[in-house]
Amino acid sequence: MTPENSKRNQQWTALFEVVICCGFPTQLLFVGILAMLGIASTDTSGTLSISYIFLLSISDTILLLFLIFYFLRQRQENPVEIFLGRRQFRGEFLFGLMLTPLILGITLTSATLLHHLWPTLRNVPENPFTALLTSPMNVALFTTAAVIAGGIREELQRAFILLRFDQHLGGAKVGLVIFSLVFGLGHALQGWDAAIITALLGALWGSIYLLRRSVISTIVSHTSFNIVEILLFLTGVSNSSS
């Protein structure tokens, strides 16, 4: 095999891995599985089902992380080196905590500007996930899903996809732009304003990973952000999409 053919094969393989791990194929798979099992996405009142969201999120997380680590192993890549780098855990953890107020500030500022300049982008008056937070059990399930499928899964997923772009698909910056847009579209259910804000946050978390080569700070800040958002919803302070 010539070097050009080898490079092309690596690019196609990397593209396949990125598409499989972007989030949509695996979620569609489990949407189909849950449908075949007779598990509905909404309850009798038409509200999103917390059981459905929890099962979908956790199942997708397990499969997606399995695929990511499988693909890394196939190329004999070290997950510890890729996801944790050489920075000290304590320093990255504290940095992640310090990032959280900045993330919240960016979110609130962006939401205010978007609602003022382009009010039509707020096509979903109320975040549909707020209707799930009706009992302590629901809050616990939703928070667990937000931490595992949101904070942890999404940051490992982002790091893996940026790695593949950096290696074979035009560079990390290209990957950062493309996956940030995909990340935003994945939250379109919460409104176009939320999709734009989420894309911006994805770009920020991705940039931090590329600069520090560790997911600890992004996982901590993303997880903390999700928890704070849930608390704001519970107290009625926030009605914005996240």
Question: What is the predicted role of each segment?
Answer:
Residues 67-72, 103, 107, 111, ...:
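Structural signal for membrane-spanning alpha-helices in multi-pass inner-membrane proteins
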Residues 13-17, 53-54, 93-98, 139-143, ...:
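Hydrophobic alpha-helical transmembrane segments
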Residues 59-64, 145, 197-205:
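Hydrophobic core segments of transmembrane alpha-helices in multi-pass, intramembrane catalytic enzymes
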Residues 152-178, 207-214:
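Membrane-interface helix/loop boundary segments of multi-pass membrane proteins
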Residues 1-81, 90-91, 116-117, 230-242:
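N-terminal, membrane-interfacial amphipathic/helix-forming hydrophobic leader that caps
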Residues 26-32, 177, 183-186, 193-242:
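Functionally important transmembrane alpha-helices
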Residues 37-53, 77-149, 167, 239-242:
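Juxtamembrane helix-loop-helix connectors linking adjacent transmembrane helices
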Residues 11, 77-78, 88-93, 138-139, ...:
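Membrane-helix interface segments
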